[in-house]
């Protein structure tokens, strides 16, 4: 996985940046994605995630993660051999992640991992709106977290 990680406001330390990078690489292997698959994660604060949520999701509140998948359509040009596929962008609010960790009674690292995996799966076409989709996504999410060693 080719991950671009942006943390302009230094919301996380190097240890947590490393966790994100390793977990994204692990997720890519779990889903058997080509090694040159690209994505980005931008770490933002409460005000910015609320603005993005309001502007693009029409929901005026903070959240932990917002995903913008780059979905293939009929009009897309096919990728040339060896050309990287960009699956999209995640915006993660570590402040909300920390609040969730405290609320749910587990470590910040586990909640950060959960948030990264959850967003990663959304970028790869998984969803949980319909019960039948949730029945696929949530067990896969739990399986990846357990295999990585981030359990409740």
UniProtKB/Swiss-Prot annotation:
Asked if the keyword Nuclease belongs to this entry, the reply reads: yes
The top EC class is hydrolase
MF terms (GO), sorted A to Z: metalloendopeptidase activity; RNA endonuclease activity; zinc ion binding
Q: What is its EC number?
A: 3.1.-.-
GO cellular component terms attached to this protein's record = cytoplasm
Which cofactors does this protein require? Answer: Zn(2+)
The residues that hold Zn(2+) are: 118, 122, 128
Q: Does the keyword Acetylation apply?
A: no
Question: Origin, by domain of life?
Answer: Bacteria
Q: Which residue spans adopt a coiled-coil conformation according to this UniProt entry?
A: none
What does the entry comment about cofactor binding? Binds 1 zinc ion.
InterPro entries on file: MetalPrtase_cat_dom_sf_prd, YbeY, YbeY_CS
User: What PANTHER family does its record include?
Assistant: ENDORIBONUCLEASE YBEY, CHLOROPLASTIC
NCBIfam families for this protein: rRNA maturation RNase YbeY
Report the function annotation for this chain: Single strand-specific metallo-endoribonuclease involved in late-stage 70S ribosome quality control and in maturation of the 3' terminus of the 16S rRNA.
Name the record gives this protein: Endoribonuclease YbeY
The source organism is Lacticaseibacillus casei (strain BL23) (Lactobacillus casei)
């Amino acid at each position: 996985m080719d991950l671009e990680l942006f943390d302009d406001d230094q919301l996380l330390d190097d240890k947590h940046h490393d966790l994100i990078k390793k977990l994204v690489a692990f997720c890519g292997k779990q889903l058997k994605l080509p090694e040159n698959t690209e994505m980005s994660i931008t770490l933002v604060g409460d005000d910015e995630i609320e603005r993005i949520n309001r502007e693009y999701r029409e929901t005026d509140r903070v959240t932990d993660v917002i995903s913008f998948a780059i979905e293939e359509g009929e009009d897309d040009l096919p990728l040339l051999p060896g050309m990287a596929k960009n699956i999209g962008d995640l915006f993660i609010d570590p402040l909300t992640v920390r609040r969730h960790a405290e609320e749910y009674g587990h470590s910040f690292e586990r909640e950060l991992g959960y948030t990264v995996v959850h967003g990663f799966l959304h970028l790869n076409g998984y969803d949980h709106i319909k019960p039948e989709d949730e029945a696929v996504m949530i067990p896969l999410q739990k399986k990846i977290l357990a295999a990585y060693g981030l359990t409740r």
